[in-house]
C-alpha cells in the first residue's frame, strides 16, 4: 500500500471528541463521480471525531474498524466509498500542520455524508482546517480495472445469452464475480472468455452520463440523479463505481470458473496484472 509519506508508526493520542456540531448533515460532494482521474484534492474539514461518538447506525458502517480509530468528514472527497460491489479507496489526508490521517475505510451515510475512517499520527484536524487528500493510486487503478472488467463480463453475457438475468455483482479482489439466474457450466467458459477478449481488444470507451429520476439505488446521487456507465454505447448500467477510461486498459480478464447454487450461476473472474495477491 502506498503511504504518501505517512509514517507506518502511528502515535497514540488521547481520544478526541467531535470538533463540530453533530447535527451537521451537509452532504459531501463526491468529485470522483465526475472525474475519476483525480488523485489529490485540497478541501476543508467539516468534522473530526472518535468513532464511539457516532450514532449506532453510523458505527455499524465500520464493523471491522478499531473502536479507538477516528472519523473525518470534509466538504468534498475524491475517496470512493465502499458500495456497489467495490471496496473503498484508502490513502492519506495531510495539512500544513503536523497532522496526518491515514484512511483505511470510507463509507457513505444515507444522507450523503462520506465518513473517512482511520488513524491520526498526530493531533486531530480542526473544523474548517484546509487539508489535502491523497488516494492510494495503485489500489484505485486495480479496483477500477476489476469494476470495468465486471461490466465487460456483463456485456459479454448480455450479447451471448440475453435471456440470463444478472442478479448480483461483486468487484472485490479475489472475490470478483457476476451472478445470473439459470444454469451455466464450465463448458460455457471458452465462449464467454472469447467474447470478453474481443471486447477488450476493441478498446471501447467507458462512457459516463447522468439521467434525471431513479433507475435503481446503485448509481444514484443524493440529488436524485442516476449515474450511468456504458461500454461503447452497447449497454447502460446504473453505477456509482470507478472505471478505467477504455476496455483496453483493464489488462487481461480471466474467467476463472463457473459455479452453481440453487438455480443461480456465478461467473468468477480476475484481471491480470493486479496489485493485490
Which residues fall in each region the model found?
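Active-/binding-site microenvironments in catalytic and ligand-binding cores
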Residues: 5, 10-277
Amino acid at each position: 500500500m502506498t503511504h504518501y509519506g505517512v509514517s507506518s508508526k502511528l502515535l497514540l493520542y488521547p481520544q478526541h471528541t467531535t470538533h463540530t456540531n453533530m447535527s451537521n448533515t451537509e452532504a459531501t460532494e463526491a468529485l470522483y463521480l465526475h472525474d475519476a482521474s483525480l488523485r489529490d484534492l485540497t478541501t476543508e474539514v467539516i468534522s473530526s471525531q472518535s468513532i464511539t461518538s457516532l450514532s449506532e447506525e453510523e458505527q455499524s458502517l465500520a464493523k471491522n474498524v478499531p473502536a479507538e480509530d477516528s472519523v473525518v468528514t470534509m466538504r468534498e472527497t475524491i475517496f470512493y466509498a465502499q458500495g456497489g460491489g467495490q471496496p473503498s479507496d484508502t490513502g492519506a489526508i495531510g495539512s500544513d500542520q503536523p497532522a496526518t490521517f491515514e484512511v483505511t475505510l470510507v463509507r457513505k451515510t444515507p444522507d450523503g455524508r462520506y465518513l473517512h475512517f482511520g488513524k491520526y499520527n498526530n493531533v486531530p484536524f480542526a473544523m474548517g482546517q484546509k487539508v489535502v487528500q491523497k488516494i492510494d493510486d495503485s489500489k484505485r487503478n486495480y479496483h477500477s480495472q476489476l469494476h470495468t472488467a465486471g461490466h465487460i463480463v456483463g456485456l459479454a453475457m448480455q450479447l451471448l445469452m440475453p435471456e440470463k438475468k444478472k442478479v448480483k455483482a461483486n468487484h472485490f479482489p479475489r472475490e470478483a464475480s457476476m451472478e445470473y439466474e439459470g444454469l451455466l457450466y464450465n463448458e460455457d467458459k471458452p465462449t464467454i472468455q472469447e467474447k470478453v477478449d474481443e471486447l477488450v481488444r476493441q478498446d471501447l470507451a467507458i462512457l459516463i452520463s447522468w439521467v434525471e429520476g431513479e433507475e435503481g439505488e446503485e448509481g444514484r446521487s443524493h440529488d436524485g440523479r442516476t449515474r450511468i456507465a456504458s461500454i461503447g454505447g452497447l449497454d447502460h448500467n446504473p453505477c456509482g463505481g470507478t472505471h478505467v477510461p477504455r476496455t483496453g486498459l483493464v489488462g487481461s480478464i480471466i474467467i476463472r470458473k463457473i459455479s452453481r447454487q440453487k438455480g443461480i450461476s456465478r461467473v468468477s473472474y480476475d484481471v491480470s496484472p493486479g496489485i493485490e495477491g
